[in-house]
Structures are given as structure tokens and as C-alpha cells.
Amino acid sequence: MQPFTTHTGLAVMIDSTNIDTDQIIPKQFLSKVTRDGFGVHLFHDWRYLDDAGDQPNPEFSLNQSRYRGASILLAQENFGCGSSREHAPWALADFGLRAIIAQSFADIFYGNSINNGLLPVALTHAQVRQLMDEVAAEAGAQITVDLTSCKVVSPSGAEFSFTLAESARHKLLNGLDAIGLTLSHAAQIGQYETQIQGWRR
């Protein structure tokens, strides 16, 4: 998993609340169990005018040329609500997104994102609104997300602090998923197992 320290990237916004996981990645695309290949189906029902995905919706932000290559997504409150499918952060990451900035997140989606290297950043309504306004005002507007200092820097240079549990921050900074975190303690685990075997003799 790619470590996340500081990322500066083009921002795109979906100015909506309660964006659920079925909107992020509809259920008909969940048959695969590997992480790759879901990006093409991200927000399928919003990105396309047809079921086959052949007719892009020109009104949807992710299809607009000014947002092509965006790596930071802005949204409103309760992002990632609905079912607990891990495919949602898979699709967002596979599309090329590194961070989601919103007013709030559904708990399960929040945890799944961290476990898959996608940084969820919760800011206040006013802060998210300012970011959206600045991004809308200037094509190519970029946002910086600094996990080392837990700060977001807007296109105009305004700084907003955010919080993240230290355990989650450690995993993202070091590119560790749950398995990687366990393996990082392999020496201690081996020492403990050796000690246990000694007790059983």
C-alpha cells in the first residue's frame, strides 16, 4: 500500500450530502474480489446516461475536462453511508483519488478507506464550502493535504487543521493495511511464540 505523507493534487467536487456506497459503486459491479478495475465503474449511475457506460454525462463533474486527473474529492456530510462494501474505497482509489474531504463520513466507510490507503478528512461545513468555492472559481485549482501536520491547504493558501486517530495516521503514513501492520510486529510475534513454546515444555 502506498504511504500517504503529503499530497498536492487537482480537486473535484460533488456538492451533495449522503452519498452512499451504492452510488459510489453500484451493486452490479461487485462480482470481483480484487481491488483493481473498479475505477471505471465509480459513480456509474451519475457518470453515464446509459446502463452500458457508453454515454458519459457531460453535466457530471468527474466527466468535465477541467477536473480530469483529479486526485482529491470534495463532498458534503455523511459520505460513504449505506452498505459496508469495501469496494467503495477500492473504486475511489482505483480512479486515482488519494483523499476525500467532507463534513463527515459513515463509520464503516471511514475505516475501510484507511485500511485501503485512502485518506478521509473531516472538516467543518464552512471549511468545505470555502474549498468548494475556491475550486469552482478557478480551473486547475489544487489542494494540499499534509498528513504529517494534519493540515489542508486551500488553493488560496488558507490552512485548515483536521484530526485523525494516531493508529490510523500511523497506518497511512507507513502504507500499512491490517496485514501489513501485523507483519510490522513480526519480530515481537516470533519472540512471543518462542516464549510460549518454552512454557509448554
From Swiss-Prot:
Enzyme Commission number: 4.2.1.33
Keywords: Amino-acid biosynthesis, Branched-chain amino acid biosynthesis, Leucine biosynthesis, Lyase
InterPro entries listed in its UniProt record: 3-IsopropMal_deHydase_ssu, Aconitase/3IPM_dehydase_swvl, AconitaseA/IPMdHydase_ssu_swvl, IPMI_Swivel, LeuD
A single Gene Ontology CC term: 3-isopropylmalate dehydratase complex
Catalysis performed (reactions): (2R,3S)-3-isopropylmalate = (2S)-2-isopropylmalate
Annotated family: Belongs to the LeuD family. LeuD type 1 subfamily.
HAMAP family linked to this entry: LeuD_type1 (MF_01031)
Name this polypeptide is given: 3-isopropylmalate dehydratase small subunit
Organism: Shewanella baltica (strain OS155 / ATCC BAA-1091)
Lineage: Bacteria, Pseudomonadati, Pseudomonadota, Gammaproteobacteria, Alteromonadales
